[in-house]
Amino acid sequence: MEAYEQVQKGPLKLKGVAELGVTKRKKKKKDKDKAKLLEAMGTSKKNEEEKRRGLDKRTPAQAAFEKMQEKRQMERILKKASKTHKQRVEDFNRHLDTLTEHYDIPKVSWTK
């Protein structure tokens, strides 16, 4: 029984952990001033705009390409918005009249 007389009987103690012990958590401050938040939001928006200008790492060709894409997209939108649904249906029916019977499908009606 002499071999078991030196046995640790309590919980194990790890080096360095006993020094830390249980610490209380710090409470978060909930009473932040709304004016400070609004001011911070305003400055953050300005900072984002400045960063966009400063961090534009596109080549001039890339910038021109994207600008032209936006321009073409706007042209497509305006072109589609210029006609009413009735006009589109009439144009489609005219197109169907010019096709041969191989592509024959019934005419589309805009009223039912």
UniProtKB/Swiss-Prot annotation:
Residue ranges the record marks as coiled coil: none
Keyword Nucleus: yes
Annotated keywords: Apoptosis, Cell cycle, Nucleus
Inducing factors: By etoposide, puromycin or carboplatin.
Example GO biological process: apoptotic process
UniProt KW Nucleus keyword: yes
Tissue specificity statement from the Swiss-Prot or TrEMBL entry: Expressed in ovary, with isoform 1 being predominant.
Alphabetical list of Pfam families matching this protein: FAM32A
Gene Ontology CC entries for this record: nucleolus; nucleoplasm
Domain of life: Eukaryota
Comp. bias regions, Basic and acidic residues: 45-58
Gene Ontology molecular function: RNA binding
Family, similarity comment: Belongs to the FAM32 family.
Function: Isoform 1, but not isoform 2 or isoform 3, may induce G2 arrest and apoptosis. May also increase cell sensitivity to apoptotic stimuli.
Protein name: Protein FAM32A
